[in-house]
């Protein structure tokens, strides 16, 4: 199995790339970080530190790397059996032209073996979005051929992979938690789905996408935002603070009530899933900084993301949402000198005031009860900070 993976960052190396390599794939990473590419090509292997109760070091072998802007990438797509990505939602559109070029070359070479493309991003149906960008760069004839021979498979991914420790001398070593979940839409494959241990097939992907978004992502973000307000440095410190924990757990229970209603999830199993996530946040071996986890507050406060989407579900089913609203107010309070979106958030709040700013960012009506409620909690948070 020939595999090409876009994004040689921590998630690429520590999660998706590792599962592909473990499955015996001939794996090539595509990235723009030249020192990383040089190191991968020189060593052909790297170490993954799996941390948790059963800590272990695993070696990933027989890998190579190419620059994602190079002609080699196009040639690799023309030959590959599977193409995966972990580049971040913003970058997906940027790699689409290269993917399209690879598919055109594949067509010209008469390669009709099935190819499956799987975007492994923190977003809902990311591969379908990538497909739209790719198709925009294809002629009608090419689109027809691609539709026949190439599967665009949506997925849900979950593994906490913090950035490398400062002062780490090995550019390739990566630290990951023990838990990992990669769920793919089994209905979207062309040909037989590849056998990859750790990749699960489902015919009800949206249930898993929303379960992860509404629980792990919602909880992680609110832990970061409340943690920063309370002066904590890491996610572990924040979630061990009883006041933070109470709101985070409350928010996950509120979003969970939406999932139970929407997808008929078993309430007891979902409660166990929430507890499992809380214990993952407590992992003493993961030094996950609240400022890093809180980054890009404008994206995280947008209509389809981890804070507003579950809130909209509570409104749809007339369910409680006080903790989610507190989380939204905390997100509005996020500050970071390093993050352009945090700076933009401050500007919007100053120019428009909290009510109009939240309405603009989230798409919620400015005169709605939930916006009033979020603004009132936000104002109380700001007053507390001022004292």
Curated annotation (Swiss-Prot):
GO molecular function, one term: mannitol-1-phosphate 5-dehydrogenase activity
Cystine pairs: none
UniProt keyword annotations, A-Z: NAD, Oxidoreductase
Gene Ontology cellular-component annotations: cytosol
Catalytic reaction equation(s): D-mannitol 1-phosphate + NAD(+) = beta-D-fructose 6-phosphate + NADH + H(+)
InterPro entries xrefs: 6-PGluconate_DH-like_C_sf (IPR008927), 6PGD_dom2 (IPR013328), Mannitol_1_phos_5_DH (IPR023028), Mannitol_DH (IPR000669), Mannitol_DH_C (IPR013118), Mannitol_DH_CS (IPR023027), Mannitol_DH_N (IPR013131), NAD(P)-bd_dom_sf (IPR036291)
Superkingdom to which the source organism belongs: Bacteria
Pfam families tied to this protein: Mannitol_dh, Mannitol_dh_C
PROSITE patterns tied to this protein: MANNITOL_DHGENASE
EC assignment: 1.1.1.17
Enzyme's top EC category: oxidoreductase
GO biological process: mannitol catabolic process
Binding site for NAD(+): 3-14
Similarity remark: Belongs to the mannitol dehydrogenase family.
Matches recorded under NCBIfam families: PRK02318.1-2 (NF002646), PRK02318.1-3 (NF002647), PRK02318.2-2 (NF002650), PRK02318.2-5 (NF002652)
UniProt-recorded name of the protein: Mannitol-1-phosphate 5-dehydrogenase
The organism of origin for this protein: Yersinia pseudotuberculosis serotype O:1b (strain IP 31758)
Taxonomic lineage of the native organism: Bacteria, Pseudomonadati, Pseudomonadota, Gammaproteobacteria, Enterobacterales
Primary gene name: mtlD
